[in-house]
Amino acid sequence: MSNKEQLIEMQGKVDEVLPDSRFRVVLENGHTLIAYSGGKMRKHRIRVLAGDTVSLEMSPYDLTKGRITFRHLEPRAGGAPRRPSPHRR
């Protein structure tokens, strides 16, 4: 996946969390593929759970693998607001 112009961007839902930080994702069109977290998501420790809606990039040469680039936030159904994460120094 070296050339950005050739990447295919899709959205899907995480169906299952697999070992080694991989995920089984079902795309909007019904196809299932294996995806991994992108580098910035690992760097900033963005956690992806089963049921999350994600954006991912795929190579046109191998449509069975993808890279998760964004986790979409679902609106919360009432309750308490989100707590800010504790700051570490």
From Swiss-Prot:
Q: Which UniProt keywords apply?
A: Cytoplasm, Initiation factor, Protein biosynthesis, RNA-binding, rRNA-binding
Superkingdom, taxonomy of origin = Bacteria
Q: Where are the transmembrane segments?
A: none
List each copy of the S1-like domain by range. Answer: 1-73
Any GO molecular function: ribosome binding
Where in the cell is the protein located?
Cytoplasm
Pfam families recorded for this chain?
Answer: eIF-1a
Asked if the Swiss-Prot or TrEMBL record annotates the protein with the keyword Metal-binding, the reply is no
Please name the InterPro entries in this protein's record: NA-bd_OB-fold, RNA-binding_domain_S1_IF1, TIF_IF1
Q: Does the keyword Protein biosynthesis apply?
A: yes
Sorted alphabetically, which SUPFAM superfamilies does this protein's record hold? Answer: Nucleic acid-binding proteins (SSF50249)
Entries under PANTHER family matching the protein: TRANSLATION INITIATION FACTOR IF-1, CHLOROPLASTIC (PTHR33370:SF1)
Q: How does it assemble?
A: Component of the 30S ribosomal translation pre-initiation complex which assembles on the 30S ribosome in the order IF-2 and IF-3, IF-1 and N-formylmethionyl-tRNA(fMet); mRNA recruitment can occur at any time during PIC assembly.
State the name under which the record lists this protein: Translation initiation factor IF-1 1
Q: What is the lineage of its organism?
A: Bacteria, Pseudomonadati, Pseudomonadota, Betaproteobacteria, Burkholderiales
